[in-house]
């Protein structure tokens, strides 16, 4: 689960729990971004966000935190982070957990085709979302990119 985690909150943890249970995941790795690409800068620097994420995850045995993006001083693109993770763990199957609203703009991310090749996207549908619209967007991305998308209700 990637994100700015500025700050990490209960919604992140609950979403991770729902997805892990719904999809039978062994673990969830939280990856705080280092240099933000799409969001405005904030008061919390990468090291602070990393420490906040570690504190939020606590002693949950299914959760861990990776510093892969925080240690990279350059721009971090999801496609490149997934590629690094895949190269380090070639036999693992990766799920990238996002809020369902992210499906609306994932095509605008750097190399979306590579993202969809390297992982299953787990789109978390929160209360109040138009589930039909989320499913329609997931179907569109599946058709256009061959994306593997699991919609999970939280």
Place the predicted regions along the sequence by residue.
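Nucleotidyltransferase catalytic core that binds NTPs
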Residues: 1-154
